[in-house]
């Protein structure tokens, strides 16, 4: 089975890459900066991103399953970039005959979502928009907890500096955290 992993330099992508290398798959990575990856003889690397259609189509060529772990949060126009990225990916995946997209998105209700979470939901909707031509599996996770994750480090820092904290009455955010190892396991479970 030929698998494409996008977002291989990210928090989840780095861990998923290591797990996929232990599986019986042919692994290809689409990355902007190949120099930032650990060299591995068992992976094929395509340099590019979802805005470079030639590189994107090359990366998806011959692929059975593609992991979509892309998010443009660093850019102030991230909502529009996320939408364009997802649409480009979906179009190229269909054109190249990919059978399945696996997307890791956020957990929440669209009507109550923050702008950031709404962007993640809209990305999932775009990737799921053509079920007759491609299967999309949408894993929706809350706060991902694990050593090195932004959420984990914020919580760890707060508990070290402020072991007891009084919060205002309006602080009522509910969260459903999930361990990073569980996210990776679910991502692997839906591979085949």
How does the language model describe each region?
Residues 3-25:
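N-terminal Rossmann NAD(P)H-binding glycine-rich loop of SDR-like oxidoreductase domains
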Residues 6, 30, 69, 101-106, ...:
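SDR active-site strand-loop-helix element
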Residues 25-32:
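Conserved glycine-rich Rossmann-like NAD(P)H-binding loop of the short-chain dehydrogenase/reductase
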Residues 35-98, 106-112:
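NAD(P)H-binding glycine-rich loop region in Rossmannoid oxidoreductase-like domains
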Residues 95-100, 132-134:
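A short helix->loop->beta-strand "cap" motif at the edges of active sites that frequently abuts
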Residues 111-140, 147-157:
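Active-site Tyr-X1-5-Lys
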Residues 157-178, 182, 186-190:
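A conserved pocket-lining segment of Rossmann-fold NAD(P)-dependent short-chain dehydrogenase/reductase
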